[in-house]
Design a protein with these regions (language model features):
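Active-site-proximal or metal-binding-adjacent scaffold patches in catalytic folds
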Residues: 1-79, 88-175
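Walker B catalytic acidic pair
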Residues: 84
Length: 175
């Protein structure tokens, strides 16, 4: 199964947010629904991470650009949503001890059907092209960037210890 549009992703995420999840911890059963815990779903414009869970704002967000770029990868998008839901549930069950990618979080993640891995494997998803590159004319080094740099950089391969104008990197717009 693949998503046909970003609206399908949103609908699926909201459906998973209203589902009841059963988590067993130390012989105690927790039945939790993310939306009933106050969590909302939204998209953001991140280009380097697929998902995010904010305990303070009670938001679970997905990268709209990465989702649009990977509509044909149901498994990855679904697992990312479950990954972020696992953060919300683990925080509810364990408090700050359950945040991050601790063993407690992995247990919760696997309990709800997530693979329990910290990050997605870049070979499994389509990554967004970098709009800019910093190029060294001396060694040919190439440093991809999503945003145009606001200051000058020098090549770390040619002069790793300090900034050196002799090895100034040239900004190239890729598209």
């Amino acid at each position: 199964m693949n998503f046909k549009s970003i609206k399908d992703v949103e609908s699926h995420a909201k459906q998973l947010m209203t589902k009841e999840y059963r988590v067993e911890v130390n012989g105690r059963t927790h039945l939790l629904i993310p939306s009933k815990l106050g969590y909302r779903f939204k998209f953001d414009n991140a280009k380097r991470r697929f998902g995010y869970c904010s305990y303070r704002d009670k938001e679970i967000s997905l990268s709209k650009p990465l989702c649009e770029y990977n509509l044909d990868n149901f498994y990855q998008i679904n697992d990312t949503i479950l990954h972020e839901i696992a953060h919300a549930l683990s925080y509810k069950i364990h408090g700050s001890r359950g945040s991050g990618h601790s063993k407690r979080w992995v247990h919760v993640a696997k309990s709800i059907g997530c693979n329990g891995k910290r990050c997605y494997d870049s070979s499994e998803v389509n990554n967004i092209e970098h709009k800019y590159s910093l190029v060294c004319d001396t060694c040919g080094g190439n440093y991809p960037r999503h945003r145009k740099p606001r200051r000058d950089y020098s090549c770390a391969k040619c002069e790793p210890k300090k900034f050196d104008e002799k090895y100034l990197l040239r900004v190239v717009q890729n598209f």
